[in-house]
Every structure is written in C-alpha cells, then in structure tokens.
Amino acid sequence: MERRRITSAARRSYISSGEMMVGGLAPGRRLGPGTRLSLARMPPPLPTRVDFSLAGALNAGFKETRASERAEMMELNDRFASYIEKVRFLEQQNKALAAELNQLRAKEPTKLADVYQAELRELRLRLDQLTANSARLEVERDNLAQDLGTVRQKLQDETNLRLEAENNLAAYRQEADEATLARLDLERKTESLEEEIRFLRKIHEEEVRELQEQLARQQVHVELDMAKPDLTAALKEIRTQYEAMASSNMHEAEEWYRSKFADLTDAAARNAELLRQAKHEANDYRRQLQSLTCDLESLRGTNESLERQMREQEERHAREAASYQEALARLEEEGQSLKDEMARHLQEYQDLLNVKLALDIEIATYRKLLEGEENRITIPVQTFSNLQIRETSLDTKSVSEGHLKRNIVVKTVEMRDGEVIKESKQEHKDVM
C-alpha cells in the first residue's frame, strides 16, 4: 500500500493594530478563542483594483504634454536653425566689412576718432541738457504741487469766507425783513393814530356843537321863564371855558401826535439806513461771491485735469496689476498641476509601500508556519490527480501585551484512490 503524506498550508494574513485577517476573514474582525479556521490551497491574492478612467485621463494628459513638448522642440529647432543661418550670414558680412576696413586703412589714415569724439561730445552735451531739463521739470513739478496745495488751502479759506458771507447775508436779510415789518407796523400805527385824531376832532366838534345847542336851549328857556336877565357874561365865560378846554385838548392831541410821528419818522429813518447798509453789504458780498465763484471754477478745472491724470495712472496700474495677476494665476496653475502630479506619485508610492508591507507580512507568516512544521512537504508531481482537501484547524489563545498566541494544528490525511486511509494531527505553538 502506497502511503502519501499530504501536508500543505496556504493562507494570507494581515496584521494591523492587533487585528489579523486570515483567508476569507473580513478585515477588522477579531479572532476569538476556539475559532476554527480551514486552511487549504487558496487562490493567489487578487491585484489591487485600478481606476482605468483616471489612468486613461492621466495617459491622455501625458500624451498631450508630450505632443506639446514635441511641437515646442520642433519650433525651437527651427528657430535655432534660422539663428545659425543668420549667424553665418552675419559672420560673412563681418568678414567682408573687415576686409573692406583693412583696405581702407591700407589706403589712407582716417579721422574716425575725431568724428566719434565730436559726436560723443555732442551726445554728452545733449545728455547734460536733458539732465538739466529733467531737474528743472522736477523742480517745477514740486513747485506746482506746492502751488496746488496753496491753492487748495486758499480755496478752502475762500469757501469758508463765502459760507460766512452767505450766513451774514441771510442774517442781514432777516434784519431787513424785520425792519420792513417794523416800518409797516409803524405805518399802520401812524394811520391808526391819525384816524384816532380825526375821531377825537370829530368827537370834540360834536361836543362843542352839543354844548352850543345846550347853551342856546338854556338861553331860550331862561328868556322865557325870567324877565330876560343879562346872561351874556355867563355864557361868554362858559364858552370861554369850553373853548379853552377844547383848545388844550386839541393842543395835547397834536403834541402827542407830533411826538409819535417824530418817533416813527426816526425809526423809519434808522430802518432805512440799516436797509441801505444791508443792501450795500449784500452787493459787496455778491461781488466777492462772483470772484470766488470764478476762482472756484478755475480751481475746479485744475482739479479735474489732475483727477484725469490720476485716473490714467490708476488705469495703467490696474492693467499692470491685471497682467501680474494673470501671470500669478498661470504660476499657481502650474504649481497646482505639479502638486497634483506629486500627489499622484505619492499615492503610487503609498500603494507600492502597502503592497510591499503586505508581502513582508505574508512572508513572515509563511516563515513562521514553515518553522513550526516538523515534516517537509513532499508531494510527487504524479499524485496531483489524487490530491483532495487537507483541513487544518487553528485555535487562538488570549492576546497579551501586544502579542498574539496561536495553536496551529496540522492535520495530515493519507489517501489512496480517493479513499482516506490514515489521519494524523500535530499541534504547534506560535507567538506573533
């Protein structure tokens, strides 16, 4: 009976942070005590999935870059060839000119040095003139800037004076209006006093007439009742008294009217003088305002020209800033493309490093398994047809201090013509 010992072990393991992946065990799942693992011939690890769309895009970008570089290289080659031809042509011309110069020198001495010295003196003189003109223009510019500051200060002062004059004019106008209102009030009072005087005169005349009528009636009554006594003296005395009283009242009213009229006349004269002064000052302020307005217009024109020059300077600076921004954007794009390419290379390097780490871990695991085996694997080539399945159970113990203790049980099955003849188990301890 032919005996064949079949011992095979194949597994994949990945250890990270105290976790282990064996065979088809999901990543991140821990092995508990008494876990039974079936170790058999496993297929080789599948390659990492590749994003072909990204690879195609990178390949297309690489092709475009290579095409642009090739076109640029061809253009540079053409330019270099044309440059070489031009250099050769200039060298030939230089040789011809050198030969002609030698011929001229051989014929007779020239005065080129004197001609060049004269031209150099002229150029130096022009340079000195331009330097002097530049200095003069700078001085004029500084003077104009100083004059501009002075004019601006003067404009501010004149503006303040104009505002003050306008305020004073408004105050004078208000005073003139008040004087006009006072004059109108005095005129109304004068009219009311004249009406009162006329009313008093009318009342006085009526009183005199009534008194005369009363005297006449009393005289008639006395003449009828008495035997015509002589009342002429009494009537004359009474008439004299009333006339004196009326005359004194009239005189007092006229005096009061005259005093009131004189007061009103003086007030009107004073108000008229104030109004005349206000009008004169208003005319002066108006003339000053016109002159200040002319100065303001001239300064406004100067200010507009300076603002126009400033806008032109700002526009030129804006264009330069825009060009600098565009150059900066291009540089940032190039930097970003370089960063992306570097990130891609780093990702590729990280993937390769992960693959290397996984391979190192698998190699270490295989080495541990092979060291734990007592018997070597001897499988003849012709017995692969009778090869069945070999089961291996793997028991794990507790994990302590970052090391994983495992009991590896190797089960050996002897088969013949598809029938199991003998089974044996061997237990090995392994610490990782």
Curated annotation (Swiss-Prot):
Q: Domain of life of the organism in this record? A: Eukaryota
Q: Which family does it belong to?
A: Belongs to the intermediate filament family.
Keywords (A to Z) from UniProt: Citrullination, Coiled coil, Cytoplasm, Intermediate filament, Methylation, Phosphoprotein
Which cysteine residues pair off into disulfide bonds?
A: none
What ranges does the record give for the region Linker 2, renumbered to this chain?
253-256
Q: Where is this region: Linker 12?
A: 215-230
Q: Which residues form a coiled coil?
A: none
Q: What is this protein called?
A: Glial fibrillary acidic protein
Describe the location of the IF rod domain by residue ranges. Answer: 69-377
Region span, Coil 1A: 73-104
Where does this protein reside within or beyond the cell?
Cytoplasm
InterPro entries found in the cross-reference section: IF_conserved (IPR018039), IF_rod_dom (IPR039008), Intermed_filament_DNA-bd (IPR006821), Intermediate_filament (IPR050405)
Q: Where is this region: Tail?
A: 378-432
Give the lineage.
Eukaryota, Metazoa, Chordata, Craniata, Vertebrata
One GO cellular component term, please give it: cell projection
What are the boundaries of the region Linker 1?
105-115
Residues bearing Phosphoserine are S13, S38, S82, S323, S385
Q: Which organism was this protein described from?
A: Pongo abelii
| GO biological process annotation, one example | regulation of chaperone-mediated autophagy
Q: What does this protein do?
A: GFAP, a class-III intermediate filament, is a cell-specific marker that, during the development of the central nervous system, distinguishes astrocytes from other glial cells.
List every position bearing Phosphothreonine.
T7, T110, T150, T383
Gene3D superfamilies according to UniProt: 1.20.5.170, Single helix bin (1.20.5.500), Vasodilator-stimulated phosphoprotein (1.20.5.1160)
Residues bearing the modification Citrulline: R30, R36, R270, R406, R416
Modifications made to the protein after synthesis: Phosphorylated by PKN1.
Which GO terms fall under molecular function for this chain's record? structural constituent of cytoskeleton
